[in-house]
Every structure is written in structure tokens, then in C-alpha cells.
């Protein structure tokens, strides 16, 4: 779609479910936020990042409602955030869990289901990958024996996987911040990268459909401005969104 004002090709619209926050600088009350590095990476890739209010009153929202609200989006980015309530995957609540919000969880899960079902290009990061896994029937390790917080490490990638194709290297440096990890992999998904200690770092669809999808456990936005390999993840999402738009 071209801009009616300039005639230039309009940026693909990338929907990003906002994160609920108890406070934010310059705001007096509770807020909805998106990580600045995340939206800047999307914008640098040529996309137009748009925050979406994660409305799910009482922790309930229908997939049909999410489909209606996100119909405008050319692509979707599920970002990091707090812990997913284990009620969604049949687990008892561990004492280490934090920042849980049933409204946020319900909305994100519905977004994941809709994106995959509708074939809408989807990049899922950290919590976002965990949400996709749970949405597809998978489970999580609620508190890893060894947390990956403020950690940068080397990750080996397997040729032939989508994540290898996008990043373009056999080994990349990743920035991690998480204390949870994937346990049982959801239906229709498979792991395509793992850390040296066995943590699932990337998942893809077992049988890719019409829409582009990739999920990673690390935070590519942390280093995207200085690492072209990490920025290519956002470029791949925006490119797929542009192709979907036609």
C-alpha cells in the first residue's frame, strides 16, 4: 500500500502487545509500555511498530475478538515480560514467579494462537516464545537451576534451520535475561537451537504454513543496533509482513 500523501511505500504495520507496568518515568500512574530497543529495532528494519492494548477483562478474551482487533496488522511481535501463570499449562505456582497478570497472559496467548492460525508473520522473543509454546500445549520450567540473567554467550546454529538462515552464521553471540525455559515442546513446534546447558533457544514450526514464524529465547533487541545478525531477525519479520501485505 502506497502513502496517499507521498506516494512512498507505507511501512508494514507490526503489532506489539503492550506490557502492563506498575510505573513508568514521567507518568503518575500505572502504564502500558514497550521496550524502546525493541520498537527501534522494528523501525530500523522498515516496520511501523504499533502498541496494542492487551485487553482481556477478568483474564478472558476470545480468539475472535483478538482476530478483529489485530486485523490491521501485517505482522506481530510477541515481546518479553513477566512470568506466565502456570495455570495455563497445568502447573503449581513456584515461589520464584513474578509480574504475573492473567489479563496479559490471556491476551498474549490469544494473539499467539491467532497469528499462527491466520498465517500472520510472527516473531516471538523470550516470554513471547514461552507464550507460543504454552498456546500450542507445551509446558515451562518455572525456575531454572541456573538463571540466564544479564548473560551473553555463544550459540551454535544448525544449517538448514530458519534461525540459521536469518542470522546467517554458524555461531552468534546472544543476550539473555530469563529464569524460565521451555520444558515439553508444544504440538507442531520443534527446537532448532539449544544452549550448551540444554536450554531451548529457538523453536520453529514442524510444518511451516503460509505465514513466517520464528521464536527465540534470548533478547535480540539488546544488541540489534550494533550486531547486524540480531537486527536481521527484525528485518525478516518486516520483510515477511511486507510480502504478506502484497
Predicted features and spans:
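The feature captures the ABC ATPase H-loop/switch
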Residues: 129
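Conserved G/P- and acidic residue-centered "switch" motifs that form tight phosphate/ATP-binding loops
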Residues: 126
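N-terminal beta1-alpha1 cap of cysteine-dependent amidohydrolase-like domains
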Residues: 1-123, 134-136, 141, 145-167, ...
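Active-site-proximal beta-strand elements of phosphoester/diester hydrolases
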Residues: 214-218
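Short, solvent-exposed loop/turn elements at beta->coil junctions and helix N-caps
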Residues: 177-181
Amino acid at each position: 500500500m502506497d502513502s496517499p500523501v507521498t506516494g512512498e511505500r507505507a511501512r508494514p504495520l507490526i503489532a506489539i502487545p503492550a506490557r502492563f507496568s506498575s510505573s513508568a518515568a514521567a507518568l503518575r500512574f500505572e502504564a502500558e509500555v514497550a521496550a524502546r530497543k525493541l520498537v527501534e529495532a522494528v523501525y530500523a528494519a522498515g516496520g511501523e511498530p504499533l502498541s496494542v492494548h492487551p485487553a482481556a477483562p477478568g483474564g478472558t478474551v476470545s480468539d475472535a475478538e483478538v482476530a478483529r482487533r489485530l486485523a490491521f496488522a501485517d505482522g506481530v511481535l510477541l515481546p518479553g515480560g513477566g512470568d506466565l501463570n502456570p495455570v495455563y499449562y497445568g502447573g503449581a505456582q513456584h515461589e520464584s514467579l513474578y509480574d504475573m497478570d492473567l489479563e496479559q497472559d490471556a491476551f498474549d496467548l490469544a494473539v499467539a494462537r491467532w497469528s499462527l492460525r491466520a498465517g500472520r508473520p510472527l516473531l516471538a522473543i523470550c516470554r513471547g516464545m514461552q507464550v507460543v509454546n504454552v498456546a500450542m500445549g507445551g509446558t515451562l520450567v518455572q525456575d531454572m537451576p541456573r538463571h540466564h540473567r544479564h548473560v551473553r554467550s555463544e550459540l551454535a546454529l544448525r544449517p538448514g534451520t530458519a534461525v540459521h538462515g536469518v542470522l546467517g552464521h554458524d555461531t552468534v553471540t546472544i543476550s539473555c535475561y530469563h529464569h524460565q525455559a521451555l520444558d515439553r515442546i508444544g504440538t507442531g513446534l520443534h527446537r532448532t537451537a539449544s544452549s550448551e546447558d540444554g536450554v531451548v533457544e529457538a523453536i520453529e514450526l514442524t510444518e511451516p504454513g503460509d505465514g513466517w514464524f520464528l521464536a527465540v529465547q534470548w533478547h535480540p533487541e539488546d544488541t540489534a543496533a550494533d550486531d547486524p545478525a540480531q537486527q536481521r531477525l527484525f528485518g525478516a519479520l518486516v520483510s515477511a509482513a511486507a510480502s504478506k501485505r502484497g
